[in-house]
């Protein structure tokens, strides 16, 4: 007599707890064949399709593993809208591993249909909008996130809210008059990237030790000389140095972003290629030291999918605009206005770029 899905599910849980991952995975797949609405079994498939921990560290999934897990997660949220873990894992796979930026915006908008007062979807959407350079709408979502209508965030969400607020402010300042649109091969930022393609981005750690630390050390030495002759003075100098470090670090972060502007621009181009499945990066930049350095910071699945996109080589139209949810209709208009303005500029000659 055939066992029911629930009886098999108990067996699958026991196998999972015993560490027999492959057997548990096969049984979970059998369960969803019997009951396609078994969200717990779909969640087990999604989780066990990803690599297990190795010595306490998470192993990055391959492209096939990430895609399989995401497919199962779509079934989880379809049948269990309240499974927050599935929404979070799916969002991470879409952005970090598969590079599907536009899909991730839709994913989190669907989560908002379930929990409209939750701040987490807005945090994730703002992060993606910043990466695509859509600052106006990122700012609008930021205002909504801090409105009284949203539910009180937990500590982790508070940190995320503060982070995206800083990202919006810094990015808007850096690209105030010149938002980089990778699809436009005539954009002047491509010429800058081409000139800087043989240079790796400045490491934050290196910048900390070569710029921030010496300044704080010198100022701290001066403060110690002036007021450090007593216990009270020593304590005062400690807090002075701590304050100086925070102030100088904040200033240095903005400076570091300006120094690495070419790398951040190329990073956006990588995101656009991954999101569209089409190429916009010139051949003479692809494979350069800068390109390899930026790609090396991405997970293996991201690099694997990008390589496949580059092999196909379908060119991204310069009139491309993001395919975004309905709440982003105004963003489409903004993109069209910027494209029209760029067409009025004279052609930019840059070796390696073809129409």
Task: Give residue ranges: language-model regions.
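Alpha-helical segment of the N-proximal tetratricopeptide repeat
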Residues: 2-34, 44, 50-61
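Charged, low-complexity cytosol-facing tails and large interhelical loops of integral membrane proteins
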Residues: 4-11, 35, 269-355
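Structural signature of tandem alpha-helical TPR/SEL1-like repeats
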Residues: 18-26, 53-72, 98-110, 133-141
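Short coil turns that delineate tetratricopeptide repeat
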Residues: 36, 81-82, 116, 150-153
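TPR alpha-solenoid repeat register
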Residues: 41, 86, 121, 154-155
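Canonical tetratricopeptide repeat
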Residues: 44, 89-90, 124
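TPR/TPR-like (Sel1-like) alpha-helical repeat modules
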Residues: 62-71, 111-114, 127-154, 166, ...
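Transmembrane alpha-helical hairpins and terminal membrane-anchor modules
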Residues: 198-272
């Amino acid at each position: 007599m055939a066992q029911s899905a629930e009886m098999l599910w108990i067996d699958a849980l026991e196998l999972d707890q015993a560490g027999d991952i492959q057997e548990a995975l096969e049984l979970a797949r059998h369960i969803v064949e019997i009951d396609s609405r078994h969200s717990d079994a779909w969640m087990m498939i999604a989780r066990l399709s990803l690599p297990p921990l190795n010595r306490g560290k998470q192993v990055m999934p391959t492209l096939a593993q990430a895609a399989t897990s995401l497919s199962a997660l779509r079934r989880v949220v379809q049948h269990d809208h309240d499974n927050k873990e599935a929404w979070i894992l799916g969002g991470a796979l879409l952005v970090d591993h598969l590079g599907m930026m536009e899909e991730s915006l839709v994913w989190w908008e669907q989560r908002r249909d379930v929990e409209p007062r939750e701040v987490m979807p807005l945090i994730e959407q703002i992060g993606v909008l910043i990466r695509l350079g859509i600052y106006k709408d990122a700012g609008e979502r930021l205002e909504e996130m801090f409105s009284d209508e949203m539910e009180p965030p937990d500590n982790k969400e508070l940190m995320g809210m503060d982070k995206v607020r800083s990202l919006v402010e810094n990015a808007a300042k850096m690209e105030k008059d010149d938002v980089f649109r990778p699809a436009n091969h005539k954009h002047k930022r491509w010429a800058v990237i081409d000139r800087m393609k043989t240079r790796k981005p400045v490491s934050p750690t290196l910048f900390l030790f070569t710029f921030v630390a010496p300044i704080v050390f010198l100022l701290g030495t001066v403060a110690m000389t002036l007021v450090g002759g007593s216990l009270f003075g020593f304590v005062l100098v400690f807090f002075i140095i701590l304050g100086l470090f925070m102030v100088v670090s904040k200033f240095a972060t903005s400076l570091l972003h300006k120094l690495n502007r070419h790398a951040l621009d190329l990073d956006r181009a990588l995101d656009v290629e991954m999101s569209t499945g089409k190429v916009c990066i010139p051949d003479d930049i692809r494979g350069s030291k800068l390109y390899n350095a930026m790609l090396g910071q991405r997970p293996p699945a991201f690099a694997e999918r990008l390589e496949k996109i580059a092999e196909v080589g379908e060119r991204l139209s310069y009139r491309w605009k993001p395919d975004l949810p309905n709440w982003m209709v105004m963003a489409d208009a903004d993109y069209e206005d910027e494209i029209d303005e760029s067409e009025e500029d004279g052609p930019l000659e840059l070796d390696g770029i073809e129409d």
